[in-house]
């Protein structure tokens, strides 16, 4: 496979010219910039294709034009060639690439030692390739060395873990004693890891249970043995629990007292407001009634006065009208010169 014909070293695709694209504006040509990025990615894939082809060919040199320019050093080249010989033999299918390279290193070192040089010369290369065709000695040596190294590494990890994990500090001295039996003694003494302060056997034992009487843990029997000491400690924990319960009860009582106080205050307030409302309402009613009565009385008096005034006015007007009528009649009679008898009769008829 040869991709070199489509791409040139200058980064331009052979089918185009920069000046032929959109009037030759290279700085603002978006298409050209995108094409350049694609070309860079293509070069990376070209190298990967070459590496894959070379690996398929067993690493042998060829005249492929896509071959990278950097050269593999001679020691690495020799080790790769030896590894290919070992792999192609098919006798060591359990080995991996790293194992082949390790065996190739042993063969290369032996060849340099035999020739008496530290450089990879043609003579060393020839001797190493000859040894690679009969590698049983080197394969056995490599496997033995690898197994020994693996065992040593495992022991080192175990010692490191033991030194850092199983040692404890007591009274400023390091205690290297074996603590393997501590867990058994710990379980037997009731200090299990479940977080229980009192074991089941303590509750079931009447003698041990009697030690809890009084809630203070002071009723131990039989001296300072471990079981009694454990019961004492457990009793202290039980007392603490009782104290906690008592505190909770006190909180409940305080809460209830607050509720009762609030209820009492509410009742007093309601009663007071009711009485005040009643008194104010009564006062208002009384005031309104008094004002109304006064208004009625005033109205009656005013009406009476007005009526009397009107009557007086009417009477006065009537009197004035009568006087005027008398004067007019007198004048009329004088004008007509009524006789005394007619005048007398007329006056009688007009005077009320």
Curated annotation (Swiss-Prot):
Biased composition (Low complexity): 148-163
Comp. bias (Acidic residues): 174-185
Region annotation Disordered: where it falls in the sequence: 126-211
Keywords: Virion
Any single Gene Ontology cellular-component annotation: virion component
Sequence ranges of Basic and acidic residues compositional bias: 126-140
Subcellular location(s) of the protein: Virion
Main location class: virion
Name the record gives this protein: Uncharacterized protein L399
Organism: Acanthamoeba polyphaga mimivirus
């Amino acid at each position: 496979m040869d991709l070199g014909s489509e791409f040139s070293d200058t980064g331009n695709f052979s089918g185009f010219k920069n000046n032929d694209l959109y009037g030759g504006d290279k700085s603002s040509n978006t298409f050209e910039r995108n094409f350049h990025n694609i070309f860079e990615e293509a070069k990376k894939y070209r190298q990967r294709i070459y590496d894959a082809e070379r690996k398929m060919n067993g690493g042998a040199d060829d005249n492929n034009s896509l071959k990278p320019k950097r050269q593999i050093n001679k020691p690495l080249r020799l080790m790769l060639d030896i590894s290919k010989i070992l792999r192609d033999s098919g006798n060591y299918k359990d080995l991996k690439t790293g194992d082949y390279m390790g065996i190739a290193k042993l063969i290369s070192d032996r060849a340099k030692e035999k020739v008496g040089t530290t450089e990879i010369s043609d003579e060393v290369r020839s001797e190493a390739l000859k040894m690679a065709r009969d590698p049983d000695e080197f394969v056995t040596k490599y496997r033995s060395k690898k197994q020994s190294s693996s065992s040593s590494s495992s022991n080192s990890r175990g010692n490191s873990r033991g030194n850092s994990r199983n040692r404890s500090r007591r009274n400023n001295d390091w205690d290297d004693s074996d603590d393997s039996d501590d867990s058994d003694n710990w379980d037997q003494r009731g200090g299990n890891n479940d977080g229980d302060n009192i074991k089941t056997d303590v509750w079931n034992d009447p003698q041990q249970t009697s030690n809890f009487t009084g809630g203070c843990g002071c009723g131990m029997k039989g001296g300072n043995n471990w079981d009694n000491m454990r019961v004492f400690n457990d009793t202290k924990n039980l007392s603490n629990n009782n104290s906690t319960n008592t505190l909770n009860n006190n909180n409940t009582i305080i809460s209830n007292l607050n509720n009762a106080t609030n209820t009492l205050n509410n009742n007093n307030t309601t009663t007071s407001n009711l009485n005040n409302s009643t008194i104010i309402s009564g006062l208002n009613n009384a005031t309104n009634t008094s004002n109304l009565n006064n208004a009625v009385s005033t109205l009656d008096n005013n009406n009476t006065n007005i009526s009397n005034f009107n009557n007086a006015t009417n009477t006065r007007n009537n009197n004035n009208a009568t006087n005027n009528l008398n004067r007019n009649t007198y004048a009329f009679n004088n004008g007509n010169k009524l006789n005394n008898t007619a005048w007398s009769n007329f006056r009688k008829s007009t005077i009320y």
